Amino acid sequence: KMKKINIEPIIQSVVDDYNSIYKVKKYIKINYENDGKKEYFINGIENRIEQMIANLLDNSISFTEKGGKIIVNISITSNRKITVKIIDEGQGFKEKDTSKIFRRFYSNRPDKFGEHSGLGLNIVKNLVELHDGKIVASNRPNNKGAIMEISFPSM
């Protein structure tokens, strides 16, 4: 059931969990940043927010080389949207039209990543939309990685 939740501690907790695993496993550091506020309220479902962030971090981690860095950034825009960005140092997207990566069963992974369903980003997109949000994928300007940006209406 949807209710007013502060997503800051939820996202911070997912980042902490992932840091404790992947700092050791792949020497990947996930930096959590915010714009100095303590509260980012949305109408949402706590475990669905966890699921979204975990899924996006899983993707970022699988495309980031050993020793790489991932940034999770949360901020409030001038038009009162809460924005969550996950910025990695992976290979970015080959697709000119990045919206297609959110399609069901779509996959752009090299074979070395093994089997996967192609459902992860589609599920994330559905969860974001359930929260009246939007998700956009883009490449970092220097072509060194990807940016996943989610925006939610704030409460």
At which residue positions do the language-model features occur?
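Conserved micro-motifs of the catalytic ATP-binding
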Residues: K1-K3, E39-G44
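A conserved beta-strand-to-alpha-helix junction within the catalytic ATP-binding
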Residues: K3-N19
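Short conserved segments within the C-terminal catalytic ATPase subdomain
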Residues: I21-E33
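Short helix-loop "hinge" at the ATP-lid/N-box region of the Bergerat-fold HATPase_c
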Residues: S60-I61
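Short conserved segment of the HATPase_c
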Residues: F93-F105
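Short alpha-helical Gxxx[C/S/T] motif in the catalytic ATP-binding
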Residues: G120, V124
